[in-house]
Amino acid sequence: MGNSLPGAGKIAKNWREVLKPEEYAVLREGGTERAFTGEYWDTKTEGVYSCRACGTELFRSAEKFESHCGWPSFFAPLAEDRVRYLEDTTLGMRRVGVRCAACDSHLGHVFEGEGYDTPTDLRYCINSVCLTLEPQKS
């Protein structure tokens, strides 16, 4: 049974050829961009955010909220089958990593119970460099 996610057919054999060095460092090596430097951390543009590596639609602006953490924050993915979760114990912390379900690229982390006034009490803290934004058509 094959992967039925929209971006699954776009998996690159050599990510270094299709991604810029800063994109590769985060998407494929699990890095993190510096807070407050990414393209989308404070954008208010309405639309759909997709995986920069494979194009799978991951998040909508309707679920984006201001967390003031320096990275785009969402309270839910577009659909649960668009992301997968991975325990992350790097840096001496216990966190839950978020990856694109179609191409297995690292996106960021999800945090629970921080007290944000959102429907899920979750904060998907996603690196801007991992995303592209398709603005909503008027």
Q: Can you describe what each PLM-predicted range is?
A:
Residues M1-N3:
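Eukaryotic N-terminal low-complexity, Ser/Thr- and Lys/Arg-rich leader segments
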Residues P6-S138:
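A short Gly-Trp-Pro
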